[in-house]
Amino acid sequence: MAALNDFETTLKEVVQAKRLSASKMTKLTEIALKSMEHDTKLVTILYRTHKSLPAAAKVSSLYAFDALSRAARNQVTKRGITGDINSEQGNAATFLLKVEGVLDGLFQDMIAANNPETKVRLSYLVVNLTCSFHGVSDLVLLAQSHLP
């Protein structure tokens, strides 16, 4: 559980900083990849933290989702990992499935902010996150219909 506490602390440092730090994002990614067996808890921490942030920090939170999803997708591809959403122990593939489950809520939250700068950044992240997931075409269409 110490790893999950480190993950949450590092995540908060990343999203509350004035600028994204590559070294902190790398540290966050390393902690997450070592803790994939706790996929549900990782996604819960990510989502809960995102929802609690002021609008200005939510874009950094989406960048964290993006970085972690890319790293998980890389592991899935390299190692041929498969995931069963109902398995007791998580892995990179089940992490992606669980992140996919909260994506709609993330995008709805960002769209509700109604900030033009946020929408431009969100459109960039939609493209990146689409590359990490399968079967999110409806979500992408929803997001694109609200973006510039």
What is the role of each PLM region?
Residues 1-148:
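Eukaryote-specific intrinsically disordered, low-complexity regulatory regions enriched
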